[in-house]
């Protein structure tokens, strides 16, 4: 499977590209400026020379032509950018990892978009795509450090069960990550808003927190997925 990352030159996008490529996926980093994405790939390859990275740099058009697409742009441009590629994204799984947040004084606070979440707005812009909300809570700095062991549950929601399964399979290949199905896309409001809580804890406790749910069975009774980690 080839995975494209729109806006993949930022910390979250490039960190995710690293993890996915090391996990065995072909990855294309997209950007409005193709030269910038090519430079980012060279930077990653120089930083991690022993991992034989095969990430490709391209523009956002190259990213949307992949089998599955992740949108890693700032939240206020996510829906607009995917809307530009609505026809190319038709029928594809599109993962949004955006959070609508604002900093008020020293605190992060969630913003509630008119449609309830960034993910819902994206689904409205590309109605023929299978939009999935996921990856909002993975710390970008840790993702981009291959010497750091990621230790996090990844909460996933979508109106398309088969898309949740596909994204879960991908997440499961990142060591330390456990995918959890959190239901329909309407729950993206809660996933996105919870990021503000996590960031506030980071500030207060001078650390980087990640979600880890307890009380789950070893096996998901619906999908049969092994929930052990």
Annotate each predicted stretch with a short phrase:
Residues 47-56, 127-130, 177:
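A short helix-to-beta-strand connector/capping loop
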Residues 1-43:
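NAD(P)+-binding Rossmann beta1-loop-alpha1 motif at the extreme N-terminus of oxidoreductases
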Residues 48-93, 100-106:
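Rossmann-like NAD(P)-binding element
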Residues 94, 98-116, 133:
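Conserved Rossmann-fold NAD(P)-dependent oxidoreductase catalytic core, especially the SDR/UDP-sugar
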Residues 114-135:
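Rossmann-fold dehydrogenase core element
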Residues 107-115, 145-162:
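Short beta-strand and adjoining strand-loop segment in the mid-core
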Residues 152-229:
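Active-site-lining helix/loop region of Rossmann-like oxidoreductase modules
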